[in-house]
């Protein structure tokens, strides 16, 4: 049995009655605590009464702390309204609202430098509540229960800039919040126009997703427009995504409903860096350099780094060893990222690199040009691996876009 209204086993019916009894003290604090609502929490915890109750009580506290009942009257800051991409547009064939997330033009670093993380989270909570309210309206309009949404992730333009560690960590926090407070509200999630980098990005956020959510993700291949039309009527799908819907002015992207983001002008910045913890610290003598080695076993892995120097600038470059098992000078190795000097004492430096060849990669901090000062450098380096199963599936589908 699915554990949904009208499809409950005797055991599940008994669990529902017991659950309602156990949590009756908090039900008045919830917007619409019908059987559909309570079953969402039970399904999310496999009908384990103790875990379901703990989850729901935690959610009630979350609603109080975040003042969720009044969140729709709150307006996000201007920069978030203008540049946080995404939006609700149309309904699928069953009447569920559709939400689009537009990844490519999203300036994640710009948002975190221009707005507080709290305001960004609050905006996403507001979006979740907006979708739930739309489900209620659709339920009344269609005369049947609508309680979940369809998501479309447009991944065209997903690049290394989106792997910036603070941005990935912030997105992970949001996913945890979503899983804990909006269970069973996702019907399906379509990934369209996924580039080669997508399996690496997915592997970073996968730990934050429940097994149930992972099962609802469908990565579509080159025929993604045809697939979407199996679930969505053409008049409910923007022309941009293979349908016939346009804005009143004829815009095929339906920009009145979907925000396409963009690079954030620096005039909006309220800080020049996001605080980070570094895993390593090293003192580099004057006229010297420091090398750290990372073995890359197969193509498609990503090296991601952050570093800061103390008091003065530092040189940084990446090389690929031509001889394994011995230290090589910079001139003896293959240059992958040209060495240059960075003012990492003023603003921490970060970056990432897709490794096209296997081998030993050397990240070299260069202080050879300094005849007087030693430099203290703090840094974190990680090797990001692709989700191999997803990578293989994308290759079979022909899902990969060139970039």
Swiss-Prot record:
Keywords of this entry: Activator, Cytoplasm, Lipid-binding, Nucleus, Transcription, Transcription regulation, Transport
Main location: cytoplasm
Alphabetized InterPro entries for the sequence: CRAL-TRIO_dom (IPR001251), CRAL-TRIO_dom_sf (IPR036865), CRAL/TRIO_N_dom (IPR011074), CRAL/TRIO_N_dom_sf (IPR036273), GOLD_dom (IPR009038), GOLD_dom_sf (IPR036598), SEC14/CRAL-TRIO_domain (IPR051064)
Residue ranges crossing the lipid bilayer per the database entry: none
Modification N6-succinyllysine, positions: 11, 51, 253, 257, 393
One MF term in the entry's GO annotations: lipid binding
UniProt PTM comment: The N-terminus is blocked.
Function: Carrier protein. Binds to some hydrophobic molecules and promotes their transfer between the different cellular sites. Binds with high affinity to alpha-tocopherol. Also binds with a weaker affinity to other tocopherols and to tocotrienols. May have a transcriptional activatory activity via its association with alpha-tocopherol. Probably recognizes and binds some squalene structure, suggesting that it may regulate cholesterol biosynthesis by increasing the transfer of squalene to a metabolic active pool in the cell.
Organism (species): Bos taurus (Bovine)
Highest classification ranks of the organism: Eukaryota, Metazoa, Chordata, Craniata, Vertebrata
Protein name: SEC14-like protein 2
Gene3D superfamilies named in the record: CRAL-TRIO lipid binding domain, GOLD domain
Quaternary structure note: Monomer.
Subcellular location: Cytoplasm; Nucleus
Origin: domain of life: Eukaryota
């Amino acid at each position: 049995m699915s554990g949904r209204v009208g499809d409950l086993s005797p055991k599940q019916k008994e669990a529902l009655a017991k659950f309602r009894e156990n949590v009756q003290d908090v039900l008045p604090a919830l917007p619409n605590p019908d059987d559909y609502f309570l079953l969402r929490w039970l399904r999310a915890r496999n009908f384990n009464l103790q875990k379901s109750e703990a989850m729901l009580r935690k959610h009630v506290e979350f609603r109080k702390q975040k003042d969720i009942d009044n969140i729709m009257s709150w307006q996000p800051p201007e920069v978030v309204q203008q540049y946080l991409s995404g939006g609700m547009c149309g309904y699928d064939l069953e009447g569920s609202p559709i939400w689009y997330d537009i990844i490519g033009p999203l300036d994640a670093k710009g948002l975190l430098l221009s707005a507080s993380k709290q305001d960004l989270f609050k905006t996403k909570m507001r979006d979740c509540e907006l979708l739930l309210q739309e489900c209620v309206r659709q339920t009344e309009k269609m005369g049947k229960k609508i309680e979940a949404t369809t998501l479309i992730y447009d991944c065209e333009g997903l690049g290394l800039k989106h792997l910036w560690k603070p941005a990935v960590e912030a997105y992970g926090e949001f996913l945890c919040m979503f899983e804990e407070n909006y269970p069973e509200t996702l019907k399906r999630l379509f990934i369209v126009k996924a580039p080669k980098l997508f399996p690496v990005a997915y592997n970073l956020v996968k730990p934050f997703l429940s097994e149930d959510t992972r099962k609802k993700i469908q990565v579509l291949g080159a025929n993604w427009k045809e697939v979407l039309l199996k679930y969505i009527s053409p008049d409910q799908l923007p022309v941009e995504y293979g349908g016939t819907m346009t804005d009143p002015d004829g815009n095929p992207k339906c920009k009145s409903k979907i925000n396409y983001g963009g690079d954030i002008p620096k005039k909006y910045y309220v800080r020049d860096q996001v605080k980070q913890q570094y895993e390593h610290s090293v003192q580099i003598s004057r006229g010297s350099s420091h090398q750290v080695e990372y073995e890359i076993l197969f193509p498609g892995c990503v090296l991601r780094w952050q570093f800061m120097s103390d008091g003065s600038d530092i040189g940084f470059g990446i090389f690929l060893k031509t001889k394994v098992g011995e230290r090589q000078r910079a001139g003896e190795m293959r240059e992958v990222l040209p060495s240059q000097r960075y003012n990492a004492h003023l603003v921490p430096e970060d970056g990432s690199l897709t490794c096209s060849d296997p081998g030993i990669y050397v990240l070299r901090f260069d202080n050879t040009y300094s005849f007087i000062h030693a430099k203290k450098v703090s840094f974190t380096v990680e090797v990001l691996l692709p989700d191999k199963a997803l990578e293989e599936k994308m290759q079979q589908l022909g899902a990969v876009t060139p970039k």
